[in-house]
Amino acid sequence: MFMKSTGIVRKVDELGRVVIPIELRRTLGIAEKDALEIYVDDEKIILKKYKPNMTCQVTGEVSDDNLKLAGGKLVLSKEGAEQIISEIQNQLQNLK
């Protein structure tokens, strides 16, 4: 993952809060009361605007590239779809 430095440094307050500057929130389309997901990658903390509908129901992968199927009731990543296809094929083989 490529990360671009903003040059912005913020201190954590006594309650563990960090303020995201308004310029950065505007640039990233983060409004007041928006939910953010928190990820950890090695020693990095990654904040991402929460998109509840794009989480793969098999792998847990969150991506805008995930597939929405069955009228939006099922969300799958490429890997999740491959796992489901493989399991269905195995089940169908066992029925024969």
UniProtKB/Swiss-Prot annotation:
One of its GO terms (biological process) is negative regulation of DNA-templated transcription. GO terms for molecular function: DNA binding; identical protein binding. Keywords: Activator, DNA-binding, Repressor, Sporulation, Transcription, Transcription regulation. SMART domains: SpoVT_AbrB. Disulfide bonds: none annotated. Residues 7-52 form the SpoVT-AbrB domain. InterPro entries: AbrB_C, B_subtilis_Trans_State_Reg, SpoVT-AbrB_dom, SpoVT-AbrB_sf. Gene3D superfamilies: 2.10.260.10. Pfam families: AbrB_C, MazE_antitoxin. It comes from the Bacteria. NCBIfam families: lp_hng_hel_AbrB. Ambiactive repressor and activator of the transcription of genes expressed during the transition state between vegetative growth and the onset of stationary phase and sporulation. It controls the expression of genes spovG and tycA. AbrB binds to the tycA promoter region at two A- and T-rich sites, it may be the sole repressor of tycA transcription. Interacts with BrxC. To B.subtilis Abh and SpoVT. This is Transition state regulatory protein AbrB. It comes from Bacillus subtilis (strain 168). The lineage of its organism: Bacteria, Bacillati, Bacillota, Bacilli, Bacillales.
